[in-house]
UniProtKB/Swiss-Prot annotation:
InterPro entries attached to this UniProt entry: FAD-dep_OxRdtase, FAD/NAD-bd_sf, SAM-dependent_MTases_sf, tRNA_MAMT_biosynth_bifunc_MnmC, tRNA_S-uridine_synth_MnmC_C
Methyltransferase as UniProt keyword: yes
Species whose genome carries this gene: Shewanella baltica (strain OS195)
Name of the coding gene: mnmC
UniProt keyword Transferase, yes or no: yes
Molecular-function GO term, any one: oxidoreductase activity, acting on the CH-NH group of donors
Protein name from the UniProt record: tRNA 5-methylaminomethyl-2-thiouridine biosynthesis bifunctional protein MnmC
Gene Ontology CC entries for this record: cytoplasm
Amino acid sequence: MTAEPNKPCQIKRDYQQLINLYPATAHTDAHYLSKLSIYQQRVFEAHSQQKLLILGQIGLGNGLELLSWWRTQANPSQRLLLKVFEPNPINAYELKSLWDQSLTLVKETPFEPHLESKQASALECKSKLSQLAQTLLDAEPTAIIGCQRLIFDDGRTTIDLHFGDIQTQLSSLTHSPMHPVQHWLILPHLLQALYHQSQWQMAKLSDDSATIATIGLSESSELSETTVNRFQACGFTVSDINELGTKALGIHQPVTLINHQPDAVLLHERQVLRQQDAKAYAFNPMAAILSSPTQSSIAIIGGGLASAHLTLSLAERGQGAQVFCKDAELGQGASGNRQGAIYPLLTTENDELSRFFQQAFLFSRRRVQALTSAPADNQTPISHNFCGVLQTAHDERSQLRLDKIIQGQPWPSEIAYAVDAEQANAIAKINLDKPGFFYPLGGWVCPFEYADAAIQKAMQLADVSVSLNTDILAIERQADGWVLLTEKERFGPFAQLVLANGAELTQFDASNKLQISPFRGQVSHVPAQFQLSQLATVLCANGYLTPSHQGLHCLGASYVKEPEHLDFCSQEQQENLMKMHESYPNQSWLEDIDMSGNNARIGVRMVTRDHFPMMGCAPDVAKILEDYEQHQLTKESRHYWQTTPAPVHQGLYILGGLGSRGLSSGPLAAECLAAQLCGEPIPLDKETLCKLNPNRMWLRKLLKGKAL
């Protein structure tokens, strides 16, 4: 783990509180583990023909069931997506404390001759469970509300941790018709906490033949009858894992894993719920699902972080792609900086923007770790350092704004915590003499190496090709798909086309009306010397300053809207220096910043007014304006825009507008678009997906009955 575990702010709950909130399902001995293993093996066997198996679990408990699902997955050609819903968020430190103080994940039991083989099997899997537990801890789950997507083994295993009120989490998700939940496991301590509405939301997300299993249901006839009746009323069949085996029955007691005769009336009720969802969010059209995982299915224009991570997310699903980059190398646009800060954008209200950036930052951080620990062959290492990010104010106004953020929420300490001036100095290893807000899991990453590593891994996993020095000048929609045109060549047709080309995002007729603006940024490169070279964390105030990498610090960045040129600017170089002087006045290390070499890099980032990236279907703006002539400024028009799918260019998608925080937001936005294109569950709630939609600026006004 990167952040120091001995900080008193990291663990706020003691062991007794933890075991009350996250109880073990049963005595974790050989008897229970054997039953659990048999049950989970049967689930995988029942769905062995599926390339992707979606499982749901209500409750985290002590984590044993989650780890056991992971361990039991044996089919190398099948991917697993496990969605775990837990009302009480927990972080890696508390999870480790829970496991450490309970001594073992699988408790030893007295030797019993008739159970010798089961006990031996349980002990054999103990080592594997411990390895998986450490892998999970290394992914740094944090105690935030919402979904955290954890991807392991190059996409073979994905775990979605949905923390927060279960009803809220379930109802916020969209149904995936191609890949619904096939089976649910409900931990017993949450059985009675599942209200009728939650059960119907589970049904909405489920396959028509999906079933439910729980543990210990048969021990209480009253609870059994009540629970079974409630779930049967939603179209489920319910089984008890404990019925799998006893000394007398062995392992032959059946557990229902597929509901072969679902009630037609109850299935209709589920469909009504799905239709209600679809109607309520009709203005936010989703991507058309790819029919087959062939390379010719999809083209991606762009060679930076967005296109690279979309390619990787598709490749993890077995989906090939053709990538077109106008430069001689990847990462030559906004992704070309030597170092970029990676940390979440937080708001006082912890609104959708703040929650998205927490999810996205953590996802991106895990991507860096995964590409570092299991790189592709001959992959260039990703230069990075998760040394934390220290945010401080630079004037009275910014201090008030920062104080509001700090005091606005009980932020999980693994996300950020306040430090006084003395602590800030100790973290930075240079004198700042002012308080701040420290993001312990943040740091810096080399963006172009990050993009290249993602592409290299994608090429290892799927049929991916990259065409460099290929400047796409025009795109055309034809009957059989999208055609891409250069000055001399023609590519396609492609069923799906994604524009992820950064500063050139608006260059085509189909995208030139996107409400997004280019901003020039000049990043100064200054030699590491004297006190300055001791800087040990990323500083963020009026501008940012990174620790040294290969003898240079990055200091930036200018922010010029719609720039006229991308040449070096001496004035912007001096402005970058002055920002540091304004942020940390009278500090002696400022004299160590030597700008005389005029060493800098200039790039353009595309920025949206609301700071969300753009991800989703490309809006057909001409058609929106045409429809607006017929439906405007009335109550009926608001209903029309609410319930009518917004006009889009079929098969064309946007992935961009990453702004200054693309390292944090880009990989998750790419993952969500890949999930849409492949018809898989998306790790974001419906409201956040609306915020990411490229049509949002127009639809926001139309849904309120305002003029465009």
